[in-house]
Amino acid sequence: MLSVRTPLATIADQQQLQLSPLKRLTLADKENTPPTLSSTRVLASKAARRIFQDSAELESKAPTNPSVEDEPLLRENPRRFVVFPIEYHDIWQMYKKAEASFWTAEEVDLSKDIQHWEALKPDERHFISHVLAFFAASDGIVNENLVERFSQEVQVTEARCFYGFQIAMENIHSEMYSLLIDTYIKDPKEREYLFNAIETMPCVKKKADWALRWIGDKEATYGERVVAFAAVEGIFFSGSFASIFWLKKRGLMPGLTFSNELISRDEGLHCDFACLMFKHLVHKPAEQRVREIITNAVRIEQEFLTEALPVKLIGMNCTLMKQYIEFVADRLMLELGFNKIFRVENPFDFMENISLEGKTNFFEKRVGEYQRMGVMSNSTENSFTLDADF
C-alpha cells in the first residue's frame, strides 16, 4: 500500500507560479494543458517539462536582438576602449589613410576667386551659390548620422576611429562651404537664405529629408542605412562635384575648384569605407533592397540637377549629367558587391582624371592627393642607421 505524498505545490510554490511561464499559457488547448497543480500529484511528463523549458528560453532571448549578436561589427565589445591589438587591419588602414589626408579650410586660397565670381553670368552665380548651400547643409546631416547612429552602434574600435575622424573632416567641409558662401555673397539677406537652405530651398529640402528619414528610421537595419549614406556621399554629391570640376576645366574659380578636389577625395574615401563596412556584415540586405535604395537616390539627384537646379545654367548638358549620375550609381553597386543597374559609360572625360595622382608642384600649392608626411609609412622607412656599405 502506497503512502500518501505531500502536495508538491505548497502555498509558497503557488505564489511563485504566479510569475511562472505557465501563467501565459492558454487553457483552450486541452491537449497541452498540464494537470492541475492543486492535486496531490503532478505528472512530470516530457510535455510539461518542455513547456517550462521552451517558455524560459523564449524569456531569456527576448531582450537580445539576434541580428546584433550575429554581427561582429555591432556585437558588444568590452575591448572597444583600447586600440591595440588591431583586429580589423583593412578598417585600420582606411583610418590611417583618412588621417594622412587631413587639411584645413585656411589652406585654401580664395583671393583670386572674387574677380572670377564677379565676371560670371547671373545663371552661373545662381547655380554655384545653390550648390554650395546644399553642400553646407548636407555635411551637417552626415555628421548627425555619424554621431546619433553609426558611432553608437558600431563596436569595433578601428571603425569608431574612422567615424571619429570623419566627423572632424565633415566639420571642415561644412566650414569650407560656409566660408565660400561668406566670401562670394555680399548681401546679408541672400547669405542668410543660403545658410538656411534646408528650410528655404525645396530642392535642397527634398534631398535633406531623404537622408534625415534614414537617420530616424528605427526599423531599417544597419546594413540598409550604410547603403543609404553611401548613396548620400557617393550619389547625392557626385553631380555637384562634377559641375564644379566643369568650372575647373574652364579655368574658373581656382579656390572653389581646389577645395572641391580635396572634399571630393575625402567623400570618395568615406564612400569606400561605407562599402568596406558593408562587406564585413554577416547579414547583408538583399540585392533587390539595395537596388531600391540606390535607384531612389539616383532619381532624386537627377531631378535636383536637371529640373530644380539644372546644370544647363553653367553650360553643361542635362542628359549627360543624368547619365553620369547613373554611371556613379553603377560604380557604387559594384563596390557593394552587386551587379550594375544602368550599365552606362562615363560621359564626362574630365571626370576620368579625378582618381589619378596629380603632378602639381607641392611648393606652388598643396595637391588634392596630399597626405601628411610619414603617416602612411612604416616606422622602419624613416629610421637612420650606420650600417651601409661604402
From Swiss-Prot:
Q: Where in the cell is it found?
A: Cytoplasm; Nucleus
More info: Two distinct regulatory sites have been defined: the specificity site, which controls substrate specificity, and the activity site which regulates overall catalytic activity. A substrate-binding catalytic site, located on M1, is formed only in the presence of the second subunit M2.
CDD domains from the UniProt entry:
RNRR2
Q: What does the entry comment about cofactor binding?
A: Binds 2 iron ions per subunit.
Q: Spell out the protein name for this chain.
A: Ribonucleoside-diphosphate reductase subunit M2
Pfam family of this protein, just one?
Ribonuc_red_sm
Report which gene this protein is encoded by: Rrm2
Q: Which domain of life is it from?
A: Eukaryota
Q: What does this protein do?
A: Provides the precursors necessary for DNA synthesis. Catalyzes the biosynthesis of deoxyribonucleotides from the corresponding ribonucleotides. Inhibits Wnt signaling.
Tell me the residues on which Phosphoserine occurs.
S20
Q: Name one GO biological process term.
A: protein heterotetramerization
